[in-house]
Amino acid sequence: MNSQLLFDDLAQRGLIAQTTDLEQLIALFRQPQTLYCGFDPTAGSLHIGHLVPLIMLKRFQDAGHQGIALIGGATGMIGDPSFKASERSLNSAETVAAWVNALATQIQQLMTPHLTQPLVMVNNADWMQSIGVIAFFRDIGKHFSVNAMIQRESVKQRLARPDQGISFTEFSYSLLQSYDFAQLNQTHQCALQIGGNDQWGNIVSGIDLTRRLNGTTVHGLTLPLITKSDGTKFGKTEGGAIWLDAAKTSPYMFYQFWLNCDDADVYRFLRYYTFLSVEQIEQIEATDKAQVGKPSAQRILAEEMTRFVHGHAGLESAQRISQALFSGQLNQLNLAELKQLEQDGLPCRQLAHVSDVVTLLLETGLASSKRQAREWLENGAIRINGERWNEQTLAQTFALYDQYYIVQRGKKQFAMVKLAQV
């Protein structure tokens, strides 16, 4: 892809928050270049907040450049204080090392199928652990002005809170990230660092340190922080983060998350997250606005993102579960799909045995009293495993795979019961 076309596309998608000299950057990227993005290990899985920078690396690779994914085995031991209200809890070296391995594996498994050339994977612990304290302060620390560092908005916010402040440990984080850029520039000729807009101060420090240590000019580009139209952070639900690991967030729940995006956000998210062209997205929006009924944008977004993260099989599974719940054909689900619902798709209770339906409705919270439970049954409002139910008894042989009952009240209230295995 032509360099100008690449940056024009990023701008049209709203993916450029801040950048160093844009004309210089466009000129530089007329030739193949190397860029990187860092990912600190704060858990054993990435979440959807990491998707935009990972997808950004792919956008550059599709244009003929080389992306580097840096896992912060060293910086993850410290914790980035940028715009955090309080000090991060420090994790043990063993925990961080396990997370580093998990993230590296996850990034490779997620991204490699979508790339003609895999991302280069690096761990900043590989170079940081060999630097002595004295050498670090002499060779790197001397290039940083405390006066300038305390003027950063992210630091000023913490200093303004006497109940929190900022420790020397977190205050020094910027030095470590800056040295990463200088190191990658020296070893991989890396010319650009990308990151969230909260990383702008750290990126600028890295640009300055690289110039001082290596005598080269490098660049930075930040992505917008993803928020919903109401100003709240995107990517969290009442149940917590939306993880990319299927064992933490099932493909079904992942699919449903995107399917439930607000109309005010969905077209912006199609630009951020998908590889549909801007023209295609504009056409989707125009079609949705012209027709009466549910817009197609949420379905398209959910399909694109679930396919990208969980593959065709994950998408098809999520769609089968969604269709089965809608149609009542729950006996069409396989055991793995029922386990997805057990994991996070439906409220699930584990019971030793089930024979009394009134008790079942009380246990699942679908009825608040025995009287109400009987009324629901008499009125035909209850379905069990897709079948309308008005009896007060239930045989275990009716359980799906001898384990599961999916109980439905009305059109939208669902609960699941798993029979405890003897």
From Swiss-Prot:
CDD domains per record: S4, TyrRS_core
EC numbers on record: 6.1.1.1
UniProt binding sites for L-tyrosine: 36, 173, 177
SUPFAM superfamilies attached to this UniProt entry: Alpha-L RNA-binding motif, Nucleotidylyl transferase
Keywords carried by this UniProt record: Aminoacyl-tRNA synthetase, ATP-binding, Cytoplasm, Ligase, Nucleotide-binding, Protein biosynthesis, RNA-binding
Residue ranges constituting the S4 RNA-binding domain according to the UniProt record: 355-419
Gene3D superfamilies named in the record: HUPs, RNA-binding S4 domain, Tyrosyl-Transfer RNA Synthetase
Any one Gene Ontology molecular-function term assigned to this protein's record: RNA binding
Coarse class of the protein's main subcellular location: cytoplasm
Keyword Nucleotide-binding attributed: yes
A Gene Ontology BP annotation from the UniProt entry: tyrosyl-tRNA aminoacylation
Sequence motif 'KMSKS' region, location on chain: 233-237
Pfam family, one: tRNA-synt_1b
Catalytic activity: tRNA(Tyr) + L-tyrosine + ATP = L-tyrosyl-tRNA(Tyr) + AMP + diphosphate + H(+)
Residue span of motif 'HIGH' region: 41-50
GO cellular component, one term: cytosol
Role description: Catalyzes the attachment of tyrosine to tRNA(Tyr) in a two-step reaction: tyrosine is first activated by ATP to form Tyr-AMP and then transferred to the acceptor end of tRNA(Tyr).
Family: Belongs to the class-I aminoacyl-tRNA synthetase family. TyrS type 1 subfamily.
Subunit structure: Homodimer.
HAMAP family the record matches: Tyr_tRNA_synth_type1
Name of this chain's protein: Tyrosine--tRNA ligase 1
Protein's organism: Vibrio vulnificus (strain YJ016)
Lineage of origin: Bacteria, Pseudomonadati, Pseudomonadota, Gammaproteobacteria, Vibrionales
